[in-house]
């Protein structure tokens, strides 16, 4: 237990102190199984991101690890690669358990695990609310090596004894700050009580509020602490522009003009409210643009269909709210449009960090009214980045 550890006291800007600084700057030098390495490259990775360079090896070595990193830094692949490296494909039982705050994120993690583990003959099942319990029970009886899910459903499955814990080696908590702020603390503590004492714990969180630190002191043994600072986040490779729009009402015409100029392979358009998402969807549909929309008011099944269509490329433009910024990870997104600038600067990275992840190129275009200029300057300062006026030849850049 690390409860007396100075580094775990909350620091004013809620950052942990790193106690580990070894870097492995290529996947080849991580001594991964050949079939896993093949999956990593097939997925489209070329070189590890900042968090992957630091965290994969200590996790694979069996240390408890706390990693503080924002969305869009490659953390899903960090723990997916680590778990795949550690598990035994011949043992048909859950060896790595991953909990996440939302269904979308859980499904996203499942897709990444399956894609990277494509050549390994492993199974990964997602246990999430809003689906039939019987389906989960049947899938878990097959003994998938990795199970990912939301805390409520995972806890339920362990209690029903269909999710067996006796072979579990790793317990991974993704977006721990989000999970605890959504009121899952008790369920997470209950899950911990049901796991073998020897289970390795890996916790990932964008911020380190007191309740997250409490989890780390209670359940982690002498953890390796890794902080990926804000400036290491990947706004690299993403060209950021703004279009000055005199009035809010003119944004729609601006967007239509942009549609005419640019061939969009795939784009996400962010608005700040659900109502605005619906309004914009109606307006664009009326102008014969094909768009789909997604926000938190929708039924789970409906959201799944929309995400599926978007991932497969049959729908090209997705209009969404911040709530879902964390759950959208589509490799082909070449363009992110902030129809509204985010209400807080932290969400900027969640939104546009999608566009050019891990060295993939992307373009972000911000619609900025006079009222937004201050926020845009704050965003530039916060991320030490430059948002330039959109050039005439923007079509060549996308």
Curated annotation (Swiss-Prot):
Belongs to the DEAD box helicase family. eIF4A subfamily. It comes from Emericella nidulans (strain FGSC A4 / ATCC 38163 / CBS 112.46 / NRRL 194 / M139). Residues 237-398 form the Helicase C-terminal domain. GO terms for biological process: cytoplasmic translational initiation. A motif (Q motif) lies at residues 25-53. The Q motif is unique to and characteristic of the DEAD box family of RNA helicases and controls ATP binding and hydrolysis. ATP-dependent RNA helicase which is a subunit of the eIF4F complex involved in cap recognition and is required for mRNA binding to ribosome. In the current model of translation initiation, eIF4A unwinds RNA secondary structures in the 5'-UTR of mRNAs which is necessary to allow efficient binding of the small ribosomal subunit, and subsequent scanning for the initiator codon. This is ATP-dependent RNA helicase eIF4A.
